[in-house]
A protein has these predicted regions:
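A short, Lys/Arg-rich alpha-helix, primarily the initiator
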Residues: 1-13
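Short alpha-helical DNA-recognition segment
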Residues: 15-34
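DNA major-groove recognition helix of helix-turn-helix/homeodomain DNA-binding modules
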Residues: 45-60
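Short, charged recognition helix plus adjacent turn
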Residues: 63-72
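Accessory "access/gating" subregions that flank catalytic or transport cores
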Residues: 160-174, 297-323, 329-343, 347-353, ...
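An N-terminal structural lobe/cap that precedes and organizes the functional/catalytic core
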Residues: 163-190, 194-255
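Catalytic phosphate/nucleotide-handling subdomain of diverse soluble enzymes
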Residues: 190-196, 201-217, 355-371, 440-512
Length: 522
């Protein structure tokens, strides 16, 4: 298209006459006609005036850049926010970020209204841009004066701030170890499956379900065939799935059990001296993005963007103190029976890729507790000893102390669990590490060494049901051994476990127990 053709095209598209163009350019209408017939060319001043009249760039008029290219040059390229997975859009969780920053001691209260205002916007590119600004604000915010906790994420600082009387390595009784390792594996798997059927349910509907199915207080698996029809149709929780004891012959995959198998594979490949970067690379290599949630999915996406640990845990990650690292602790306890120091160190190297502060401590604590449970028969003492491996002035220690103080003070079981739910709103903190750790500790103490009672209490209380019962079952299974886990818990799935791990798929639990011993002796 010639320059004359373009002048004619834009003039007619704008509904302008030659006379009006001539008047604006201070030329005759005959001059405009000559421009359009390419018998003469407008001066530079006239080209500039024409581009203003047509509201286009000068190069679009003079060089011949078409409309599509002009729009592309002006536009920004953005993702389709409606297609992103829930946990991938930082701006969707700005109030989670605000609350998280506030709780970890940052002086951000003056920005509360701003966070709320941006949170109310619809998802589009400018909301994400505003989210980036808010992220910079909280990242660089100072700590509040007189904040009572000290919660480092650096391992050297963690070790400086823990109890110096932490226990040394103690050799386990080899004649009992086979039973203990099997108990830990099955304890975790059965507990996870018990809570998986109703993962995400709120306590009002959970209590109604248990009562209407004759399972209150909870004492057995949930069966699909027992759920009342009106609950299937009208409940807020979606019961329409097949993760029920009467519908399976193999434990379905779940992130809580995926990680246990995944980290066995990690140790096989990298050995006991693996590094955080090894874990990050292994995540990408061995599982799809859909296998990760909240902090883990954020970290996974950060790996792809080029962030390495520990930055991968910190960049636009409002879930950095959620439960995701805590549920990854178990295998490090399994392969270090009686050696909580090494178990906690391994847990740190894993946790730091996706979590900070109490998110890290949750994994370190339960790795240490499981290692201690291999050589300690007193649950109260084991809980106390494991606390010594994390910072003593942390919110995590405070949470555990709230439970142990109630237990030691004779507070009855019902009251203790009620206090947990009164402290933490289940809609806001359902997946946060602190309330769920409280539930696990209370379940272990008030469960009185009874496997069924312990995992059922962990589920019946609500919040992150599968995570809590899995962790409680793992700790108690290690302490009491496989003989303490009744057949009613193990029989529905025939020793088989499904995973989402590439190249692994369905596994035989017995084989995984055998590999654990290889790693203990590695």
């Amino acid at each position: 298209m010639t320059l004359g053709n373009r002048i004619y095209k834009y003039r007619t598209e704008h509904g302008l006459s030659r006379e009006s163009i001539a008047e604006k350019c201070s030329v005759s209408s005959q001059s405009v006609q000559k421009w359009e017939s390419d018998n003469s060319k407008p001066s530079l001043e006239n080209l500039i005036m024409l581009s203003k009249i047509f509201n286009i760039t000068l190069d679009a008029l003079a060089i011949g850049v078409d409309e599509g290219v002009r729009e592309e040059r002006k536009a920004f390229i953005h993702p389709d926010y409606s297609e992103e997975r829930l946990w991938e859009t930082y701006a969707d969780f700005l109030m989670t970020e605000y609350n998280q920053s506030l709780e970890e001691g940052k002086d951000v209260e003056e920005y509360e209204k701003l966070f709320k205002a941006v949170s109310c916007l619809k998802n589009f590119e400018y909301k994400e841009c505003l989210g980036d600004i808010l992220f910079d604000i909280v990242t660089n915010a100072p700590m509040r004066e007189n904040y009572e906790f000290y919660e480092p994420s650096d391992l050297a600082e963690i070790k400086k701030s823990r109890d110096p009387s932490a226990m040394n390595k103690k050799e386990p009784n080899q004649s009992l170890l086979q039973s203990k390792i099997a108990g830990a594996w099955y304890g975790r798997i059965c507990g996870c499956f018990l809570g998986k059927s109703i993962e995400g349910i709120k306590t009002d509907e959970l209590n109604r379900l248990l009562k209407e199915t004759g399972n209150y207080p909870m004492h057995r698996y949930i069966k699909k065939s027992e759920i009342p029809e009106d609950m299937l149709c009208r409940a807020r929780f979606n019961f329409d799935h097949d993760h029920y004891a009467d519908l399976i012959d193999c434990v379905p995959s779940d992130d809580d059990t995926n990680y246990t198998v995944l980290y066995q594979e990690l140790i096989t490949k990298y050995g006991r001296d693996f590094k955080p970067r090894d874990v990050a690379a292994f995540w990408i290599e061995k599982q799809p993005k859909s296998a990760y949630y909240t902090a883990e999915e954020t970290a996974y996406c950060n790996f792809i963007k080029g962030f390495t640990p520990p930055a991968s845990a910190m960049y636009k990650n409002p879930f950095r103190e959620w439960i995701g690292a805590q549920i990854r602790a178990d295998y490090f306890g399994y392969i270090n029976p009686g050696d909580p120091e090494t178990a906690a160190d391994m847990a740190y190297r894993d946790a730091v890729i996706s979590h900070t502060k109490n998110g890290i401590y949750g994994e370190m604590y339960f790795a240490a507790l499981i290692a201690i449970a291999a050589v300690e028969n007193d649950m109260r003492e084991a809980i106390e000893q494991a606390l010594k491996f994390i910072p003593q002035k942390s919110r995590f220690v405070r949470s555990v102390r709230l439970i142990t103080d109630d237990y030691d003070g004779g507070v009855d079981e019902s009251k203790c669990f009620s206090k947990i739910l009164s402290r933490w709103d289940e809609y806001t903190y359902g997946c946060h590490v602190l309330p769920n750790a409280e539930i696990v500790i209370a379940s272990l103490l008030y469960g009185d060494g009874d496997y069924g009672k312990t995992i059922c209490r962990a589920v019946q209380t609500g919040l992150d049901t599968d995570c809590n019962a899995a962790t409680a079952g793992s700790v108690l299974g290690m302490m009491t051994g496989i003989s303490a886990i009744g057949e009613e818990w193990t029989s529905p799935f025939g020793g088989k476990l499904e995973t989402q791990i590439f190249g692994v798929g369905k596994v035989n639990i017995g084989d995984r127990i055998d590999i654990t011993f290889e790693h203990i002796n590695r």
